[in-house]
Regions:
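Helix-rich effector regions associated with P-loop NTPase G domains
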Residues: 1-27, 34-35, 40-53, 60, ...
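Canonical P-loop GTPase G-domain recognition
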Residues: 54, 60-121, 139, 240-241
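Short, well-ordered alpha-helical segments in soluble proteins
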Residues: 101-108, 123, 134-138, 146, ...
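Glycine-rich phosphate-binding P-loop
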Residues: 117-142, 166
């Protein structure tokens, strides 16, 4: 699956990030804990250069805990990177970020020398929710649709830390087929840019391979059901996703599956492991 989807505001956001870079002390990149590599924008990685970075693995409550431990180890092997799994609405977990920022930029955060933190991430990874929790009030708009934040914001946390929010930023062409498909399954890409049924079939094939027990228990599938198309049809029949003549409405069945997978109804699922992922070209020229 090759996805070419780059709204105009994202090109503008990239330039805004570049303009702010000289003033930034720490990067705070918000990732989806279920797919930390695919939800990491390689353009942002290149832009931050050697600035210290905290990679927040948000939606940790939805991810496979054992796989998340592997990701923390893999990410912290990178120069200047600290990894922190959390759930963005959990204030106690989120408050750990400030302490890490002070460790990474020890000469900042004092009177007259604010510690400036740029919060970055692709759409729909929970960046706005995290900012609201850090601020202790609603600052950024929150929703389950990608690309809600469209202009930069500066938020003074009143503790010597200034947050610089930026719009969710995808890269111009996502030509890594598996990475693009995993992003689509997670909901990071607007569903109107996708073949929804194809996304569901990819997700079902993944579940049959990695988490077959959870899939079969949720939808009462037999052990003999191993084809993603058959599973989608079974889900459609059992959930009443039918059209005239008793045929399956594949789109509605896909909606049921993807909605439940994204919400964690199928259990704690990680969509990729460190060994699954090859380096991604930023393609930002």
């Amino acid at each position: 699956m090759i996805i070419d989807w780059y709204p105009g505001h994202m090109k503008k956001a990239r330039q805004q990030i570049i303009d702010l870079l000289p003033r930034i002390d720490v990067f705070l990149e918000v990732l989806d804990a279920r797919l930390p590599a695919s939800s990491a924008n390689p353009v942002l990685e290149r832009l931050r250069s050697d600035k210290p970075c905290i990679k927040v693995l948000n939606k940790n409550d939805l991810a496979d805990q054992q796989v998340t431990k592997q990701w923390v180890s893999a990410l912290q092997s990178q120069q200047g990177v600290r990894a922190l799994p959390l759930e963005a609405r959990n204030r106690a977990e989120v408050n750990k970020i400030i302490g890490l920022c002070r460790i990474l930029a020890p000469n900042r955060g004092r009177p007259g020398r604010s510690l400036r933190v740029m919060v970055v991430g692709i759409p729909n990874v929970g960046k706005s929710t995290l900012i609201n929790t850090l601020a202790g009030k609603k600052i950024a708009r929150v929703g389950d649709k990608p690309a809600i934040t469209t202009c930069p914001q500066q938020i003074d946390l009143r503790n010597g830390v200034l947050l610089h929010d930026s719009p969710g930023l995808l890269w111009p062409v996502m030509d890594n087929p598996d990475g693009a498909s995993r992003l689509a399954v997670s909901g990071a890409i607007g569903d109107n840019a996708l073949d929804y049924v194809a996304v569901a079939l990819y997700g079902l094939a993944f579940m049959l391979d990695r988490y077959p027990r959870q899939l079969r228990e949720r939808y009462k599938l037999s052990e003999e059901t191993t084809d993603p198309g058959e599973v989608l049809e079974s889900i459609g029949r059992k959930r009443g996703c039918l059209v005239s003549g008793g045929q399956i409405d594949s789109y509605r069945a896909a909606e049921v599956f993807l909605r439940e997978l994204r919400a964690g109804t199928l259990g704690r699922i990680s969509l990729e492991q460190p060994d699954d992922v090859a380096p991604v070209d930023s393609n930002d020229d």
